[in-house]
């Protein structure tokens, strides 16, 4: 597929593409983290270029402008790629349809796997070849052990984003750089950018889904949502919900039903349009079923191996 790539800040773009020195393409959002990643790589004498994805939503154009501005300040080329069609198909549509199936989507993980390290990676190679590393401002690490490269947690436990990166192809990991992996706080990152004099240093951190705020994403999934019963494990109806898309497994708050003891969502049954709740003791499970498994270190999988699983980004 041919991608529409714009040289938004064409400074030294020809020289970068033909540079014999070690090169890195920084996927930039125009925020503090990706700008800090670029600064750190410049200190390591990488020849840099920036690339930003352009998608049709309210924040996309400002991200491109901000990233382009940062690249101009750094004196490096910047490219933008319009991937609206792919983003809608690979991230937004699955996000919306998951709720109607009683599932809780993870759009950030989908975006990392299918867009940043998928579509954007392919667009970069189509334009620039493959003799460069790809860097982002994620708080995670790539470690090398016995000639193999592995995805690892970032040093900052609260900011660690390895959970959202676990879908990346193992074949791509050797070419990936996470310069912020050893940073232990957001203030440390912001301090680096501030000391460099970049105007982006005071840009606020975004905590929302990039393509919709809380109200917006509720509106996106409300079209096929219908009221239905909330019941307990005995079948007793305790109340009503406004649509199964507003609930997720393990949820306790916002159920809208009165009870002497805390109740948790333990099951969502789409075909019955039903939400099932139970006590904390009943909410635990001894078995889980994993889907879309991506094995990054198959050599460690051995019979009898004891493993830990992680079901949300801030879980253990």
Predicted feature descriptions by range:
Residues 1-167, 185-188, 192-194, 265:
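ATP-dependent adenylation/nucleotidyltransferase module used to activate substrates
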Residues 7-13, 17-21, 135-316:
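AMP-forming adenylation/ATP pyrophosphatase catalytic core
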């Amino acid at each position: 597929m041919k991608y529409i790539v714009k040289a938004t800040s064409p400074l030294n773009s020809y020289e970068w593409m033909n540079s014999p020195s070690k090169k890195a393409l920084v996927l930039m959002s125009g925020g503090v983290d990706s700008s800090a990643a670029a600064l750190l790589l410049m200190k390591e004498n990488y020849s840099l270029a920036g690339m930003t994805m352009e998608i049709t939503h309210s924040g996309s154009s400002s991200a491109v402008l901000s990233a382009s501005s940062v690249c101009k300040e750094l004196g490096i080329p910047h490219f933008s790629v319009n991937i609206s069609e792919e983003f809608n198909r690979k991230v937004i549509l699955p996000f919306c349809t998951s709720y109607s199936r009683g599932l809780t989507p993870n759009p950030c993980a989908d975006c990392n796997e299918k867009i940043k390290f998928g579509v954007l990676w392919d667009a970069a190679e189509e334009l620039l070849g493959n003799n460069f590393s790809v860097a982002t401002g994620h708080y995670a690490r790539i470690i090398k052990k016995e000639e193999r490269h592995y995805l690892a947690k970032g040093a900052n436990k609260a900011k660690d984003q390895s959970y959202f990166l676990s879908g990346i192809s193992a074949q791509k990991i050797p070419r990936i750089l996470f310069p912020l992996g050893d940073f232990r706080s957001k203030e440390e990152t912001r301090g680096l950018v501030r000391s460099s004099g970049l105007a982006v240093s005071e840009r606020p951190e975004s905590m929302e889904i990039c393509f919709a705020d809380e109200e917006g994403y509720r509106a996106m999934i409300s079209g096929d949502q219908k009221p239905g019963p909330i019941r307990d494990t005995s079948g007793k109806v305790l109340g009503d919900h406004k649509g199964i898309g507003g609930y997720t497994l393990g949820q306790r708050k916002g159920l809208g039903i009165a009870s002497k003891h805390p109740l948790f969502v333990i099951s969502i049954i789409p075909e019955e349009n039903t939400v099932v709740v139970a006590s904390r003791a009943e909410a635990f499970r001894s078995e889980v079923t994993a889907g879309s498994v991506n094995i990054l270190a198959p050599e460690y999988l051995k019979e009898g191996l004891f493993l830990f699983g992680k079901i949300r980004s801030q879980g253990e």
